[in-house]
């Protein structure tokens, strides 16, 4: 659920031992964002090879081909390329952020928690993600209710 700029700004020390990351978001506000087991495993594998990517010492977590901090444009290009290779065209990093929020809401998370994870100032901004959940509720009701 991170913004591309937040992901690119992560430093190694941003990762916490309890599978959370300390993220500096919009307005220089810090928040703690959890991540799951698959991300933890991927990060562990990445951290093993990361020293080979660094051309000089850097605190940056994600590195580009020249060994410096990966920039948001390069991150977007990577997402577009990997999505196309996977046969999922027209997907952006923001689509992934939107999907993460939607999955949290559909999984039963409350709106306030999702707001905190996404780093939104306003609950109204987070509410934009609820329309998909409402649609899913309607579909489930129609399919499951005997008199719908």
List the predicted regions and their residue ranges.
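Active-site/catalytic core of tyrosine-dependent DNA strand-transfer enzymes
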Residues: 36-88
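Short, basic (Lys/Arg/His-rich) helix/loop patches that form interaction surfaces
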Residues: 33, 68, 76-116
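A short, glycine-centered helix-capping/turn motif at helix boundaries
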Residues: 1-9, 107-109, 120
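Conserved tyrosine-mediated DNA breakage-rejoining catalytic core shared by Y-recombinases
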Residues: 3-48, 59, 124
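DNA/chromatin major-groove-contacting recognition/catalytic segments
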Residues: 38, 45, 132-148
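Short, polar N-cap/turn motifs at the start of nucleic acid-interacting alpha helices
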Residues: 14-17, 71, 88-90, 109-128, ...
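Short alpha-helical segment immediately N-terminal to, or the first helix within
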Residues: 10, 103-104, 117, 140
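Hydrophobic packing within well-folded, soluble alpha/beta domains
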Residues: 7, 35, 43, 79, ...
């Amino acid at each position: 659920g991170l913004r591309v700029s937040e992901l690119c700004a992560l430093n190694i020390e941003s990762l916490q031992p309890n599978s959370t990351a300390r993220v500096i978001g919009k307005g220089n506000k810090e928040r703690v964002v959890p991540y799951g087991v698959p991300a933890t495993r991927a990060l562990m594998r990445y951290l093993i090879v990361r020293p080979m990517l660094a051309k000089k010492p850097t605190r940056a977590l994600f590195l580009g081909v020249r060994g410096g901090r990966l920039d948001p444009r390069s991150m977007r290009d990577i997402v577009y390329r990997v999505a196309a290779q996977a046969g999922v065209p027209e997907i952006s990093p923001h689509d992934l952020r939107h999907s993460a929020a939607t999955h949290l809401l559909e999984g039963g998370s409350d709106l306030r928690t999702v707001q905190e994870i996404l780093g939104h100032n306003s609950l109204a901004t987070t509410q934009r993600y609820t329309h998909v959940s409402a649609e899913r509720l309607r579909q489930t009701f129609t399919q499951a209710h005997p008199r719908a």
